[in-house]
Amino acid sequence: MLQPKRTKFRKQQKGRNRGLAHRGSKVSFGEFALKATGRGRITARQIEAARRAMTRHVKRGGKIWIRVFPDKPITEKPLEVRQGKGKGNVEYWVCQIQPGKVLYEMEGVSEELAREAFTLAAAKLPVTTTFVKRSVM
């Protein structure tokens, strides 16, 4: 699963997920892409589950790019532990998603196959998404 090799600090504050994605909002590598239309956070497990669903559907044909990386640690305290005594341990990593962010890209397959693969991937993700094609300038 994806997670940073090393970070400056082990734990982060919660923060707020506001605004739109201006960076990473264009199709840069492939021909087709899955773009987020809602906001939320995607865990490393969800990123991997969606990638596996797409890869299996296209039968290892074409190329897939993952455009998001989980770089935010989420901490949790164990069950039945009272509040206080410091912040909990890092349990998993997430990527915060704003509307407009490109999540995955694909090339080397037909549009129909790409749409089907992205539909399978979208079912694994907690944010609403849409299918987009590279715009020719």
From Swiss-Prot:
One of its GO terms (molecular function) is structural constituent of ribosome. NCBIfam families: rplP_bact. Part of the 50S ribosomal subunit. InterPro entries: Ribosomal_uL16 (IPR047873), Ribosomal_uL16_bact-type (IPR000114), Ribosomal_uL16_CS (IPR020798), Ribosomal_uL16_dom (IPR016180), Ribosomal_uL16_sf (IPR036920). This is Large ribosomal subunit protein uL16. PANTHER family: 50S/60S RIBOSOMAL PROTEIN L16, LARGE RIBOSOMAL SUBUNIT PROTEIN UL16M. SUPFAM superfamilies: Ribosomal protein L16p/L10e. GO terms for cellular component: cytosolic large ribosomal subunit. Belongs to the universal ribosomal protein uL16 family. Binds 23S rRNA and is also seen to make contacts with the A and possibly P site tRNAs. Residues 1-22 are annotated as: Disordered. The keyword 4Fe-4S does not apply. The gene is rplP. Pfam families: Ribosomal_L16. Keywords: Ribonucleoprotein, Ribosomal protein, RNA-binding, rRNA-binding, tRNA-binding. GO terms for biological process: translation.
